[in-house]
Amino acid sequence: MSNFVICINNDNNPASLILGKVYRKLPDVEAEAHDMFRIIDEDKSEPDGYLYPSSMFAPVELPEAAERALLAADA
């Protein structure tokens, strides 16, 4: 499963999520069991991310160089 997702619906969270933007999805088995994703959003005040419905995102497979760049930007 991809570590990155793209926002396809930000209707309820336009300040926290940008439509069409790629976000890092943090591992959270319990959240995913409830169809939720733990996401590092635009707020970035919560290092553990926030929970959002998985229906707001689509998984994205990125080239390795792009993944490295995005992970480095989060560090």
What are these regions (language model features)?
Residues 52-75:
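C-terminal structural segments of small proteins and small subunits
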